[in-house]
Amino acid sequence: AAMRYTETRLAPIAHKGFLEEIGSETVNFSNNFDGSQKEPDVLPAQLPFLLLNGSSGIAVGMATNIPPHNLGEIVDGLVALVKNKDISDKKLSNIIKGPDFPTGGELIYSRAIEELYQTGKGSITIRGVVNTEEVNLGKGKHKKNAIIITELPYQINKAGWIEKLAELVNSGKIIGISDIRDESDRDGMRIVIELKKDSNSELVISNLYKKTTLQTNFGAIFLALIEGKPVQLNLKKYLNYFLEFREETIRKRTFYFLKNTLDKLEISEGLSKATKNIKKVI
């Protein structure tokens, strides 16, 4: 074995949320792989980053696939749980309405999201954001109806999706499309799908959902390690475990500060006595 390292770019909130309390004896440290250094068993996270960032992993006989969530909704959910520990799953899911995927897309709300939050397992349907408009083809040319896609579902590669769509159009599996252009720029994504003269835009959009990954399912499972053991958690249990962890972390941090303060007090008392009896000390 040899030293390995992983670099990651953290936002300021992540650096503060992960590492601010690391030096206050808030978490246990263990030997690294060769015993040359100590490393934290866990990080003293101030936010439930497993839910915020999401996570995906696979092992023998198990897997986890946690979608990312909105920071504001998660914090509101934690506050509601602190105020009422007996809050129902339904009320909690009214606060945390669903995953928040960074690449956008639209969630098709259904019983599946409630099932995910109540059981810790479920399948979420995601669609790209689609609009129709008339596009100008140039000076002296007629305008043409087009489908405009401004967001794709989570983890769908734009270039790969356009290439696959072109293959389906060329093979005749999707009809009614005359041209596909990528007009994306710094302001955001814009995929223009020009329609043939007599095409039905609603029918074309329906085929895009059915035959491409413009609509996908995200199979989620909230599997996490609790005291080193994999456990499937529903949303409320996960948030409760996080609150318990924060209580423990804050308690350890407080004892650390108390210990340091008492040590300083002992030194101050010693200096005070020495000052009062300076001749004897000398």
Task: Show which residues each predicted segment covers.
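Long, charged, helix-rich clamp/arm modules that form nucleic acid-engaging surfaces
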Residues: A1, D100, K144-A146, P153-Y154, ...
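Catalytic phosphate-handling regions of large nucleic-acid enzymes and associated NTPases
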Residues: A1-T125, R190-V192
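Signal for well-folded cores of large energy- and translation-related assemblies
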Residues: A11-I22, D34, P48-L52, V79-K83, ...
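Structured alpha-helical segments in the cores of large, soluble enzyme domains
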Residues: A14, L43-L51, I124-E133, L165-I177
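A generic structural signal for alpha-helix starts
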Residues: I66-H69, I156, G160, S199
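Hydrophobic side chains in well-ordered alpha-helices
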Residues: I74, W161-K164, V204-I205
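N-terminal non-catalytic structural scaffold regions of very large proteins
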Residues: I96, A112-E114, N170, A220, ...
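Long hydrophobic segments that form regular secondary structure
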Residues: N131, V135, K139-I180
